[in-house]
């Protein structure tokens, strides 16, 4: 059984962060946080709670770096804390990236850190009362995602939940684009890599049979990276890619492929301070598009999140929660666009198709 998006993720949320969980917690819901602890970190907190006021917290997850490092788990009801459960082990490191996953099960939360089981916490209050997640402390988050094994596939794209709202303005028609000859960097034959759709490699996120994880753990990605897009693209389909640009990066690219053709080529080039978009049909590149509404959104040595939304007439692209561009379809049969390729001077941390 595959996991499906229960709601759109929060991208680069500002800490402290509090946000709603659409529909509340449900059995089978997996909540994944990816971020980095600060080098001076003492502690941070993830709360699953009822409403924004914090008086009722079903699950308080609190890593503390003092005293050798340990993690406190607890529940607060009507403003009163219950007995603490302490795990005298610290799975996080100061100043280092992490992936933290919570799986809601009938009788407990299961917690994974960097794809390894860490702790389980028995429910003290009904989990369906939880409708809010709150994160605070000495950390920086790249995203919070929500995946549900019981949810049907959503073919209608819901409102984006970037921590800062994304605006997708219409692109003025009739704009002329500059034409240049271009060969993409880091080409690799697709037959060299076979990856099953958004399933963890290697290892297993949770021991629950029949529920494979959707989010790759950080070490599982290799560049170039390929994965199929099940059933191809369709209007409202979205793809999210997060990662880190290497400090000495020259370029990288994201390709949406249709067999041997490339329907959408997104190619940040740092030496040119440009983001090139193009289509390749029968090994021939079309006219490049380079214009941007603002400045170059990618930086060497910095993390990024790219959100690509397929609409009926175009792709809409947001970077770090901000609209970057639209790209009108040149290959019209969207369903045949069924492979994602990422390559170049980056480290991948998250892919969601």
UniProtKB/Swiss-Prot annotation:
<feature type="binding site">
    <location>
        <begin position="285"/>
        <end position="291"/>
    </location>
    <ligand>
        <name>a beta-D-galactoside 2</name>
    </ligand>
</feature>
<dbReference type="GO" id="GO:0019899">
    <property type="term" value="F:enzyme binding"/>
</dbReference>
<dbReference type="GO" id="GO:0045089">
    <property type="term" value="P:positive regulation of innate immune response"/>
</dbReference>
<keyword id="KW-0963">Cytoplasm</keyword>
<feature type="binding site">
    <location>
        <position position="265"/>
    </location>
    <ligand>
        <name>a beta-D-galactoside 2</name>
    </ligand>
</feature>
<keyword id="KW-0391">Immunity</keyword>
<comment type="subunit">
    <text>Homodimer.</text>
</comment>
<feature type="binding site">
    <location>
        <position position="64"/>
    </location>
    <ligand>
        <name>a beta-D-galactoside 1</name>
    </ligand>
</feature>
<feature type="region of interest" description="Disordered">
    <location>
        <begin position="167"/>
        <end position="186"/>
    </location>
</feature>
<dbReference type="GO" id="GO:2000562">
    <property type="term" value="P:negative regulation of CD4-positive, alpha-beta T cell proliferation"/>
</dbReference>
<dbReference type="GO" id="GO:0005576">
    <property type="term" value="C:extracellular region"/>
</dbReference>
<dbReference type="GO" id="GO:0032496">
    <property type="term" value="P:response to lipopolysaccharide"/>
</dbReference>
<dbReference type="GO" id="GO:0098586">
    <property type="term" value="P:cellular response to virus"/>
</dbReference>
<comment type="function">
    <text>Binds galactosides. Has high affinity for the Forssman pentasaccharide. Ligand for HAVCR2/TIM3. Binding to HAVCR2 induces T-helper type 1 lymphocyte (Th1) death. Also stimulates bactericidal activity in infected macrophages by causing macrophage activation and IL1B secretion which restricts intracellular bacterial growth. Ligand for P4HB; the interaction retains P4HB at the cell surface of Th2 T-helper cells, increasing disulfide reductase activity at the plasma membrane, altering the plasma membrane redox state and enhancing cell migration.</text>
</comment>
<dbReference type="GO" id="GO:0002376">
    <property type="term" value="P:immune system process"/>
</dbReference>
<dbReference type="GO" id="GO:0050728">
    <property type="term" value="P:negative regulation of inflammatory response"/>
</dbReference>
<dbReference type="GO" id="GO:0001819">
    <property type="term" value="P:positive regulation of cytokine production"/>
</dbReference>
<dbReference type="GO" id="GO:2000406">
    <property type="term" value="P:positive regulation of T cell migration"/>
</dbReference>
<dbReference type="GO" id="GO:0032760">
    <property type="term" value="P:positive regulation of tumor necrosis factor production"/>
</dbReference>
<dbReference type="InterPro" id="IPR044156">
    <property type="entry name" value="Galectin-like"/>
</dbReference>
<feature type="binding site">
    <location>
        <position position="60"/>
    </location>
    <ligand>
        <name>a beta-D-galactoside 1</name>
    </ligand>
</feature>
<dbReference type="GO" id="GO:0032815">
    <property type="term" value="P:negative regulation of natural killer cell activation"/>
</dbReference>
<dbReference type="GO" id="GO:0032733">
    <property type="term" value="P:positive regulation of interleukin-10 production"/>
</dbReference>
<dbReference type="GO" id="GO:0043032">
    <property type="term" value="P:positive regulation of macrophage activation"/>
</dbReference>
<dbReference type="InterPro" id="IPR013320">
    <property type="entry name" value="ConA-like_dom_sf"/>
</dbReference>
<dbReference type="GO" id="GO:0010629">
    <property type="term" value="P:negative regulation of gene expression"/>
</dbReference>
<keyword id="KW-0430">Lectin</keyword>
<dbReference type="GO" id="GO:0032689">
    <property type="term" value="P:negative regulation of type II interferon production"/>
</dbReference>
<dbReference type="GO" id="GO:0005634">
    <property type="term" value="C:nucleus"/>
</dbReference>
<feature type="domain" description="Galectin 2">
    <location>
        <begin position="225"/>
        <end position="353"/>
    </location>
</feature>
<feature type="domain" description="Galectin 1">
    <location>
        <begin position="17"/>
        <end position="147"/>
    </location>
</feature>
<dbReference type="GO" id="GO:0051353">
    <property type="term" value="P:positive regulation of oxidoreductase activity"/>
</dbReference>
<dbReference type="Pfam" id="PF00337">
    <property type="entry name" value="Gal-bind_lectin"/>
</dbReference>
<dbReference type="GO" id="GO:0030246">
    <property type="term" value="F:carbohydrate binding"/>
</dbReference>
<dbReference type="GO" id="GO:0007157">
    <property type="term" value="P:heterophilic cell-cell adhesion via plasma membrane cell adhesion molecules"/>
</dbReference>
<dbReference type="GO" id="GO:0060391">
    <property type="term" value="P:positive regulation of SMAD protein signal transduction"/>
</dbReference>
<dbReference type="GO" id="GO:0032755">
    <property type="term" value="P:positive regulation of interleukin-6 production"/>
</dbReference>
<dbReference type="GO" id="GO:0032722">
    <property type="term" value="P:positive regulation of chemokine production"/>
</dbReference>
<dbReference type="GO" id="GO:0005737">
    <property type="term" value="C:cytoplasm"/>
</dbReference>
<feature type="binding site">
    <location>
        <position position="47"/>
    </location>
    <ligand>
        <name>a beta-D-galactoside 1</name>
    </ligand>
</feature>
<dbReference type="GO" id="GO:0005886">
    <property type="term" value="C:plasma membrane"/>
</dbReference>
<dbReference type="GO" id="GO:0016936">
    <property type="term" value="F:galactoside binding"/>
</dbReference>
